[in-house]
Amino acid sequence: MKNYLYFLLFLLGLLHPLTAQDGDFSQQSFLLGGRNSAGNSTQRSNYNPIGERADPDAAHWDIPTLDTAKDVDYLTGIEKDVILEMNKVRSDPAKYAELYIKPRFPHYNDKRYMVSETLSVLTKEGRAAAEECYNALKAMQGVQLLFPERGLALAAKDHVMDIGQKGQMSHTGSDGGNPVTRAEKYGAGYKNLGENITYGTSSGRDIVVDLLIDDGIPDRGHRDVIMLPGFTQTGVSTGAHTRYGIMCVIDYASGYVSN
């Protein structure tokens, strides 16, 4: 199964979309505010829609503070887990690297990541990408937490419902809409807006770790979005994808006010 990660960051400025295709690996790249990023493809595990929210490493974190989505009624367990994992790494990147990135090192066999004895993930860079992520996070300072925003979650859900049932992979909806138009349907006033999408990854932590390692993406644009200090709000939606089992759309903003 393929897993595609796409990155889109809207900062006040011009949008210049670039696209490329390589076999069955569809890749979109966008240049916004002077930055360029692209998508990547890896093998992923089977679809497991919603798991328990139990965290065996909870003792290492101030969960009541970091779990900003725990009381909202419009997110599933996995969607809340995505926000929790993003807040963990934003609050203490070095600790996150030690707990969740470094332990992956021994599981690489050349370009394959061994999920278990019988399941492996084909990567583009192998252990080198995880090591680069570890070193980068160790050098970062913490940034402010993300808080759930209903309008962003609704915008993300619209995109999941739209392209998921069609088996598509894109930031662009079937109606030609993009993250900005979807967000503006449910709110306004944002200062900046970003979006990450994953396909085929089925747990909150795996979604965030995959985006952080950003295997095959030279500028690690997905990691940059997660760690961008300017973002304070997020909306997450997961759902079925006819080709890859599950997909997750994560929208980010600051200054956004839901309708």
What are these regions (language model features)?
Residues G23-N48, A59-H60, E79, I83, ...:
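A structural boundary/capping signal
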